[in-house]
UniProtKB/Swiss-Prot annotation, chains A, B, C, D:
Task performed by this protein: Catalyzes the conversion of ornithine to proline, with the release of ammonia.
Domain of life according to the entry: Archaea
The organism's taxonomic lineage, starting at the top: Archaea, Methanobacteriati, Methanobacteriota, Archaeoglobi, Archaeoglobales
Keywords carried by this UniProt record: Lyase, NAD, Nucleotide-binding
Family (UniProt): Belongs to the AgrE/ArgZ ornithine cyclodeaminase family.
Residue ranges the record marks as coiled coil: none
Record field: catalytic activity: L-ornithine = L-proline + NH4(+)
CDD domains cross-referenced by the UniProt entry: SDH_N_domain (cd12144)
Annotated source species: Archaeoglobus fulgidus (strain ATCC 49558 / DSM 4304 / JCM 9628 / NBRC 100126 / VC-16)
Binding-site residues for NAD(+), renumbered to this chain: N233, A234, D312, T344, M345, L346, H347, D365, D388, V389
Name assigned to this protein: Ornithine cyclodeaminase
């Protein structure tokens, strides 16, 4: 039997961390004895717990401690982080540490270094005295990579307490809730975040490209509510097809019915943009006169269009190498405080994987399974709305305008 | 080898009836020889076809003719319908004819009698020289029931030709179409139907009971757009809970968050209405002050609430015997020209089964599979919209008001 | 400021009860001070907590205590339950207590009476010194009904600890899990429950009626694994249609393709069973020779077929009054230890509402949203499997047979 | 008023081509007069129709003819195809012809050239006297590109007539059909296609990677039923994780429950394969010992893993540039007779876009909307099965083995 003392501090009960700790120990067939347990007597007091954890042997104990570590357990005697060299590019030393999406610190040179660019399923390297969270494919030979859990501290975000829609809905999906009220609450969150100088990214799928939703997103960009647009080839092509031909995938967007020969508009649009030298040039030349991409370019809102194997064309601005696209997305997301995901599972999951746990996310999709999947990131900073994005966006824009008018 | 001559008349090619006829013959391993085929030379000319159908033997030929009959084939020498007596209540003679939902005529006494109250999966009886379509459980001993296909003529509706949303979308589901445009087109259909004195039934599930959608439906009733409401216990209870407590299933409908103890409101509502002696009395006594049921009662719009095994209570007006409820629904639907089905699969399918094929139906649901199922009634008079009914209804009301203002 | 002392005992942290208690107090803007908190030092030790709860005034404090009560809080000075008379049939006294689905006790005559037939959203009456949980419509004038929370004690079930699929999956949906492994685990649960003399009810929708699934369910009944079948008219009609005509809804069940004229089989089946005098008589007369209903009758497994407004016919055994059906279902479910819900949302939710929280439930449906909805009963005794019931049942039967052979 | 004579030949009525022709003319507000209409008198006789089509003016007539052309209309006086030079790489001449996925011929030098590599939404270029169907991004400066519809002939496939599952289910989705019978029919199709020397490609998503389904797919590859595997990084990583760690996304695949620290296995797997130099090398070195990728390599079945922005790693064999991946997929699909799509929307749609209309496709997914979307390719050569791929694959393998044993 091997034993080790661990301690926890924070809103232990409120955030269910202590419950999870006991669960982990029992699920792994470990034992525990609680030495001390101080619950905060008042609302804002932190709690503190100290316990001895028992394992069958060193390996078993180590396994338990690894899991406890991930939810914030501290092993009182502070040790330096353990490092090992990467033997080749993209090749990692044995037992390398895999990151969570929570804020993380490593004990290095007697100090707690914050890990920069934290996001999940990556590794930590120390370069020039700073700790970076990087994907496998950016590891270069000789990189000093963190191995094991020693000297690594994870700080899961506390549950939001003040009265916001995130606090109320945090981590849940609203398929039974009144959609219009949810949209009002989200409009308020967006408005207040922008008031405080926050930054918002929009991740959008091609379903956004029907008249009213497209116009609403274009208006949100024009009015300064969007700081970054992440999407793919299809969204841009459909958006530009509307501007050039007045059709979306060959359908007249005003009458909502197919235009004869309209299916060709899709490829004709791509060809026109390629001939012009890209989206920006096509806007300069007056070929594209309105819409989502137009407003991005005119208002200097950066956009990243990542390629997929479904793409026709693609448009010149599309980044066809997915690893390059992913890297650019990661960089562009730095400093973003909220991400609004609109009707795209692939892009939303990809972006979700690149975000730290404290970035607020709002996921909107008609399919409840998609929303549930997107929400499953172990964070209270996400809300899911199961609704029709084609009606959601115009209403969101209207609600924001109403709030603007009132304040 | 047995042969028989059959003939078809109408928009044969356009409505794919001729294609189906050949399909049926070949699927059943029959043979055919076309004797005459006149295609209408202009848009509105009917076509005419005459052919010999071959079967291996009498039974095989009969089988083929049975199927051809259902899509409108006529066997030129006109025979009287064949009748047989029901040996006991609810017991049918062998080989009884099963109805489709298309307009149907029977040759009786040398005349073509229209079959009254036609709807699918029922039987035809002749009473006092008139032909009625009735369900099995209404057959009484001695009823003269139609057996076989002889002397029965089915007239499937032609595809709508003029430029309406039914012609355009007829029989299809709009999950990829711009929702807002669809709603506009539906608003126009409703407006024009009412202008011409048409009658509209609404079939609604409890998902309608969130503030804006509920208010929109109540307003549509108040403004005379609804002639009949078909629903269940839950819709009425939630609607009344909002009126009495301001909550829906215990959630504050303005703030969209649960009210402490709110889960009790559901049963308290039921209890209050029972104590008052029913919905109508509760409105008279001023207990219920607004909402869907309130507007129905105040505007003399009939409603039928059919019971289900999920019901709490139920409210006194709920018909707990499903066969009684079904019979009342069938009667109330007589003369209805359009049915709007809102977020309820059980009630929508039940109502769909009671309708002739020429009644227009609009099905709205968030789940594409539900809409597809509801559409599957062999008619071009149905359109399906995959969207959030909570946003659909307020927008529909708005669009109708815009049309009213313009005209 | 008003204050009251409350206490909790049990696996407080493990079952998250303490977390919920603090949540409730803070959500309602109350305050608390923890007086004592003893965490069980070992796995099986219960925990104990005592705290003072503060409210703004009596009403506010009462509101908080009501909510705490529902999760098991005790107010140390024990008071008798408060009763009030029902002024008329189905009419309840003000402030009546609404039940949860957890085991509940009331303090009456100085003793703790267990509330019989507990299930959610009902009321408690005291009759002849015993406490009964009954629906509103069974309340009769003069019944002594529990009002308020005083003297009522709710005991939410502890989370299952031993290594079963319920412990592992408890309260979760398996859309990402290996279906075959899940089925194996469920087969073992069923086998072991029956070994111990447990009783199993099956709730089944008509989707079960395709060859292999129907045969598997019939075999499970024959082999004694089913003690009660709850379903509707459609399941029975399709099952019997297969036995009489070899078709299901007109499709040849061996070749999987429609049989000419097969759509009539549905009504012909109903007519034959009505003519025979019901399902049992039709089996006696040799009209029905195999299948689900056949095995129920032959093996004396009771079945309840509840009517719905979609029903054709219906068959004579169908209970067309939903309140009567519900009452019979409630009675039949007494003593059942596990309920398997197969591809039917309406019946599954109805049955779920009739069950105490400690009855194990297994929900199988292709639609993840349906499963999620069915699981949402505040219990760890439920598991959901998102899969095709047509493949699930044959495999389940196979796995049970493999376990039988091994043991 | 402008007029032009057109003619049609083939199974016009049976394939609904004539119906569609009339629809097109009427939808575009054109007029027609039928000059001749000969229906095949016997089952296998082709039909022939000749009609005059009227348009308001040249442009209108041209528009109608364009649409008629796409469904196979011939304009009797045969003209050479019209060509125009591409002014720059990836830049197309005005009015370029956009391909369908049906077999297509162009009239060039007095002869009908078959268009090679036909698939939808591409362009046709003439190079060295041969006609090629290529995507926009492969057009090079100076390419002679087909413009307009003149001299282009499209031959939509006739509906399958012999009694196969494709004939029966062609173009439809089986959510109400008995799954087990469908699987049997598909097993027979696969077996017979391989007997005749046909080639089968499998497109698979990561949901396949649960024990039984993975083992079944591996066995199908080993037994020679798969000639090409198209997938992404995730499928390969999970498959290899099972081989190395016995877990899939950190879950024990035998017990179906998470393994402590198992979430790391995902990245550890990627790292091990990168370190080995790729999948093939890792198999050679004995690191990977079984599974889908193992069988591909051991049995020389080519595989293409296309990258996506969700990918971790990725594995060295993954093609991260989507346009390169797409081109390789197109090449590999040459000569494939059947494609089985398993639980992946992105890859299935991408592959569907690369296929000619006569390649048989079988789409399996749990989500009915996904299957419906995949089927929507205007072909009768597709069948969709809504079921659980985790149970589908083992059963499919079993059924194929049963057929093998019998024959």
């Amino acid at each position: 039997m091997k034993a080790r003392e661990v301690e926890f501090e924070g809103h232990l009960i409120d955030s269910m961390i202590f419950t999870k700790a006991l669960d982990i120990i029992l699920d792994l067939d470990g034992e525990f004895e609680i030495l001390e347990f101080r619950v905060g007597k008042k609302k804002d007091d932190p709690s503190y717990a100290r316990m001895i954890v028992f394992g069958r042997d060193d390996a078993h104990l180590e396994q338990i401690l690894k899991e406890l570590h991930k939810i914030g357990a501290r092993i009182p005697d502070i040790e330096e982080v353990e490092l090992a060299e990467a033997p080749a590019d993209k090749v990692l030393p044995d037992g390398f540490y895999v990151t969570t999406n929570h804020p993380t610190f490593v004990r290095y040179g007697g100090e707690w270094l914050p890990v920069e660019d934290i996001s999940m399923d990556r590794v930590i390297v120390i370069r020039d005295g700073r700790a970076y969270c990087i994907p496998i494919d950016e590891v270069v030979r000789g990189d000093r990579v963190v191995v094991g859990e020693k000297g690594v501290r994870v700080v899961p975000p506390e549950r939001p307490r003040k009265s916001t829609v995130f606090e109320f809905m945090g981590g849940r999906v609203s398929s039974e809730r009144p959609t219009e009220r949810m949209i009002e609450a989200i409009a308020r969150e967006i408005y207040e975040l922008k008031l405080k100088g926050g930054k918002i990214a929009v991740v959008a799928g091609p379903a956004v490209d029907h008249t009213s939703a497209r116009n609403a997103l274009a208006a949100l960009i024009r009015d300064g509510y969007v700081d970054l647009l992440l999407s793919g080839n299809a969204l841009a092509v459909h958006d530009i097809e509307i501007s050039i031909f007045g059709t979306s995938l060959g359908m007249d967007i005003c009458k909502g019915r197919p235009v004869p020969g309209g299916n060709r508009h899709h490829l004709y649009t791509i060809s026109k943009v390629i001939a012009a030298g890209g989206i920006k040039k096509a806007i300069e030349k007056g070929i594209i006169k309105d819409g989502i991409m137009y407003e991005c370019v005119k208002n200097n809102v950066p956009f990243i269009l990542a390629g997929s194997i479904r793409d026709d064309g693609p448009l010149p601005e599309v980044i066809t190498d997915v690893m390059v696209a992913k890297k650019k997305m990661k960089e562009a997301l730095r400093g973003i405080n909220m991400v609004i995901m609109l009707a795209t599972m692939l892009h939303s999951i990809a972006v979700g994987n690149l975000l730290p746990s404290y970035v607020k996310t709002i996921c909107v999709d008609m399919n409840p399974s998609t929303v549930t999947k997107l929400m499953d990131r172990g964070t209270h900073q996400a809300i899911g709305v199961v609704t029709d994005v084609g009606l959601f966006l115009p209403l969101l824009y209207l609600k924001i305008k109403e709030i603007e008018a009132k304040e």
